[in-house]
Every structure is written in C-alpha cells, then in structure tokens.
Amino acid sequence: MATERKSRTKRAKKEETTWQERVIQIRRVSKVVKGGKKLSFRAIVVVGNERGQVGVGVGKASDVIGAVKKGVADGKKHLIDIPITKSNSIPHPIDGVGGGAKVIMRPAAPGTGVIAGGAVRTVLELAGVRNVLAKQLGSNNPLNNARAAVNALSTLRTLSEVAEDRGIPIQNLYI
C-alpha cells in the first residue's frame, strides 16, 4: 500500500514537469484604503504543455513571486484542449473575442512558423501550434488578447467532430 502511494506521487511530479509557464505581464497595482495606498502585483501567466493544452491565469499578491504562483495555479484550472494537425497547425480559420480584443487565426503551411504578436504568440507557442498566422485587432491589452486567443482555440473542431455532429461519415463530408 505504501508503494502504491509512493508511485502515485512520483507520477504526479513527473506530469508537473511537462508544463511550461510564461509570464506575459507583471503590473504593480494599488488599492486606496483608509490608511493610504496598498500596493500589490498582478501577474498574467500562460501555462501549456506544447501538446495541445493551454490556459491563461491571473494572480494577485503582495509580492511578484506569489502573484506568479497564483497565476500558474489559475492557468492550470482554466486549461483547454485543442486539436493540432499533422503539420502542427490549426484545422481551420477561427476568430475569438475577449473584452475589447478580437483575434483572427488562420492555418499555415509547414515551415511558416508562428506569425503572431504579443500575448497571442505566447498562447500559440505554449499550445504546441508551430505554423499559424494570427492578427490581433481592437485592443493592445495583453490579458484581453490572451483570453481572446484561448476563446478562439476553444472553438476549434476536427473533421471527425464535424462529421459526427452532422451524422454523416467523414468520406461524405465534402461531397
């Protein structure tokens, strides 16, 4: 029984090491209270395993390290799974909205790379997408752009999912 427990904890630690995290922004924010201003830090963090799972998290704490840790935990709570094609791209063109930000993504040929800016680039890289074209419109806010990218990626569907929804075999999908 003790060995069972030991092996479970080792496996959990092994899974932990596969996650990568990148800090998009650290901002010092203040709250006005009776005694003056109370300073704290807000960290926006993207967490992904580069194999189709990614999440965006926000953490606030009185120190930077605490804010980043909370952001990583929040990102792991809000993970999404995305389908990635054999050419390490997305299956079809999509767009997503988060706040005032709009993100447009299109699949790209192998060797193109990730052509995107700012927070959207970070989200796509940590999701494991290697060939994609993306454009962010409407806002330069990193949090809204990251959330718009995650919203867009969450709407991706594979050919088999589309065929199943329509109730037809995959061979008859484009006939």
Curated annotation (Swiss-Prot):
The keyword rRNA-binding belongs to this UniProt entry's keyword annotation: yes
Keywords (A to Z) from UniProt: Ribonucleoprotein, Ribosomal protein, RNA-binding, rRNA-binding
Keyword Ribosomal protein annotated: yes
S5 DRBM domain: residues covered: 19-82
Gene Ontology cellular component annotations, sorted alphabetically: small ribosomal subunit
Domain of life: Bacteria
InterPro entries with a match to the protein in the record: Ribosomal_Su5_D2-typ_SF (IPR020568), Ribosomal_uS5 (IPR000851), Ribosomal_uS5_bac-type (IPR005712), Ribosomal_uS5_C (IPR005324), Ribosomal_uS5_N (IPR013810), Ribosomal_uS5_N_CS (IPR018192), Ribsml_uS5_D2-typ_fold_subgr (IPR014721)
Spans traversing the lipid bilayer: none
Subunit structure: Part of the 30S ribosomal subunit. Contacts proteins S4 and S8.
Function: With S4 and S12 plays an important role in translational accuracy. Located at the back of the 30S subunit body where it stabilizes the conformation of the head with respect to the body.
The family this protein is said to belong to: Belongs to the universal ribosomal protein uS5 family.
Stored HAMAP family: Ribosomal_uS5_B
Name of protein: Small ribosomal subunit protein uS5
Gene name, Swiss-Prot/TrEMBL: rpsE
